[in-house]
Amino acid sequence: MKILFTDNSLWGLLNFRGSIIIHLRDLGHEVVMVSPVDAPSKGMNVPDGVRHIAINMQRTSTNPLHDVRYFFRLLSIYREERPDYIFHFTIKPNIYGTLAARLLGIHSTAMVAGLGFTFSHGGLTSKVAHQLFRFALGFADKIMVLNEENARILIERKVARKKQVVLLEGGEGVDLERFRFSDNQSDKTIFLMVARVLYDKGYKEMVEAAKIVKRTHPEVEVQLLGPVDEAYPNAVSKEQIRLDEESGAITYLGYTTEPEKFMGRPGILLLLLSNYHEGLNRSLMEGCALGKPIIASDIPGCRETVREGENGYLVPPKEVNALADAMLRYLSLSDEEKESMSINSRKLAEERFDINSVKSCYERILQECMN
């Protein structure tokens, strides 16, 4: 089969779906990726035997002319490539790609990785996007979702029909061979957040909690790893990051295509403090696989990575004091208790987040199409 993967970011395809793309290639399928080339993807390599078609799109633009151009460009690519199946990811590919596939009679699946900005914010733009989403996804064969709460909301809001929904209970999965358990024992504790640098990811709460913790534990480090995307709604500016570094609250590590090199260091505890629904957060799943304790927001897409008190703590979103309390609670644990949390994180990853179960799901969807 010829299979297309269409996303709003080459980085997203390689980072989140790279293992699936390589797996389908190895099964003998012809795989083509369609996406813009974004800044974070520079330095990342397209897998051997896989083609990439670069396409212009304005990810965050609300100008309808930009979207019309994007739709007709997708239509042209799909007509020329004539794939047997297309997987779409993120809002604009899900809307315009699904419609283009429908017009050409091509089977497709849309992945709704999370209910982020469009579903969580009010305003006319979000309402229009929601209606477009609802209309377009009616033409998808399947709609992949990453947690039960998101599935429920999509069905209740009539964005998806129950028979369309495919629940990936372990999210998009983690390669447990790449992200191996590592000894986390250390005299030093580092609280690390791995995420796009957005206020929606809990940036402000992390900074304020860091200041509270450092009053009594000045030796503790709070670090941030992830791309800065100032074009995105609710992005944190580079100037704000600089100011927070100068205050001593945090250390910004920049961005890397190999997060395990930072996450795998001894003494790491992972933070993810999203204010709104996630799909199933990738960095937290990777942290579990590496054997890192977790502190995360008690929201869908984050809470699935934490067993309270066993491998970490859940905190209410936007609650700075609750976050600081959880960080201080972890610091008060004995070495044996911290080690137990690390072991429990790895066990959870092995039980729930193995990438092999996700590969099987893609295979089943394609098999249904062939039948």
What is the role of each PLM region?
Residues 270-271, 293-296:
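Short hydrophobic beta-strand element within catalytic cores of glycosyltransferases
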Residues 226, 236-256:
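Nucleotide-activated donor-binding/catalytic signature segment of Leloir-type glycosyltransferases, i.e.
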Residues 14-19, 198-212, 285, 321, ...:
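A conserved mid-protein helix/loop that constitutes part of the nucleotide-sugar donor-binding site
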Residues 53-54, 134, 138-180:
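Donor nucleotide-sugar binding/catalytic pocket of nucleotide-sugar-dependent glycosyltransferases
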